[in-house]
Amino acid sequence: MLLTGVNLLLRFAGTVFGVYLSRRIGEQGLGLLQLTMSVGSLAMIAGIGGIRTAAMYLTAEELGRRGRRGVNRVLSGCLGYSLVCSAAVGGLLWVFAPAIARNWIGNTGIIGALRLFSCFLPITCLCALLTGYFTGENRIGVLAAVEIGEQIFSMGVTVLCLALWAGSDPERACRSVIFGSAMGSLLTLSLLGLLYRRERNPVDASIPIGRRILRAALPLAIADTCKGGLSTLENLMVPKRLALATADPLGAFGRVTGMVFPVLMFPACILFGLSELLIPELARCHCGGGEKRIAYLLHRSLKLSLLYGVCFGGLLFLGGNALCLRLYSNPEAGNLLRLFAPLAPMLYCDAITDAMTKGLGQQHMAVRFNILTNILDVIGLYFLLPVWGLKGYFVSFFLTHALNFFLSLRHLLRITGQDLCAYIPLWTLTCAIASVWLCGKVPEPILSCAAFVPVFFSSLYLTGVLKGEDLRWLRRFTQAK
């Protein structure tokens, strides 16, 4: 429950902060910030170079083999790898910042923001390394407390910079956000470094570690960088191709990525916490030959994520306009949220499917599916955006995410030898459509949303889709963790 609570708190804080930014710099400023952070995200993925996951696995492995004698050796080797990788990527970002700003983003005013990001990149990557190390030691409570402190401190510094220096200037706002994030990373690095120094682990310099680090980190680095590169290419391409169909492409991009998506995916933070619990549980069952337990978890998790996604999809569809008017004073964002709301069940179920796939040791297949659908998304956006504008963005988003979900679910069912009954999804969608239609006749959005939940779940109970044992299982599963 700790991970779920932390995810919920951090996602809520991030959403509130996003609303503050949207009111401060507008949708065009949000679009520019999203493009800048997309480039920064790619640099961070390349700079981390898979070392977070490698440090986590190698630390856990050493603790299981030799106790704490080999932990120092693991961390020192990972530290050298991280410094070399992050410094190289940071140097490249500094050198090519003018070309990236001019040719990719189309705004030379953010050269300073990109170079500021490059200066603090090693600190961010070292934070990822120490996070992986403490995760390998299973010190989740420590990481949760530090992460909350980092988020609060980062947002505080950013708000201070915006209020005292940046104002509503988009370029300065980008630098303020990057500086605030860097200060949060610096705080995390300091705290985790102090905690590590207090451990006083014995040193065993005879343990060979270099090749093990490369074997663990390099495949992850290549896969993550390819995926991140495609995602960045997609984000950078959207405003350029939208410019052929709309007069304000940057504002449209900021409206979708900075306003609609945070609200659409906010309820999923609870499922993300559940997915963190599923990965180790399924891994234990897989190693211990617990096929019946795997089948039970698969059906229960997919069913509850479907019901959860359909419920919030209906709420966002009914209350999307009122919610976006309240948060952003932007009716166009409300229309877009209603357009994307029916995709919530698929997106939420996909998150659980990915977690179960990883728990069964099939991470490489998830990476393959993601890279394939990202390539198709880039192709689809290139051709559809100039013709249909944001509707083309929606079509490409829907088709590629549906394909990714289909491939992931099919692979999960194949490796577990399970089948799904069509009765539950068909009746769930039927009940949802009927409930939305009925509650949509209520003129007040708040009342229609309030009526939707009991109407929807009553219809599920009457049709036999929802049973008391489903809720009892969820309560037992989360309380046991």
Report the location of each language-model feature:
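Helix-loop junctions and terminal segments of transmembrane helices
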Residues: 49-64, 265-289, 295-301
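Membrane-proximal transmembrane or re-entrant/amphipathic helices at the cytosolic face
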Residues: 440-481
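Signature of the first transmembrane helix
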Residues: 1-56, 90, 94, 120-121, ...
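Transmembrane helical elements of multi-pass membrane transporters/channels
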Residues: 2-14, 180-188, 192, 196, ...
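Short runs within selected transmembrane alpha-helices of multi-pass transporters and secretion channels
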Residues: 10, 18, 49-56, 116-135, ...
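Interhelical loop/hinge segments that connect adjacent transmembrane helices in multipass membrane
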Residues: 170-178, 193-227, 289-292, 414-428, ...
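Interfacial transmembrane-helix starts/ends
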Residues: 34, 68-84, 92, 210-217, ...
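Interfacial segments at transmembrane-helix termini and the short loops linking adjacent helices
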Residues: 97-116, 315-347
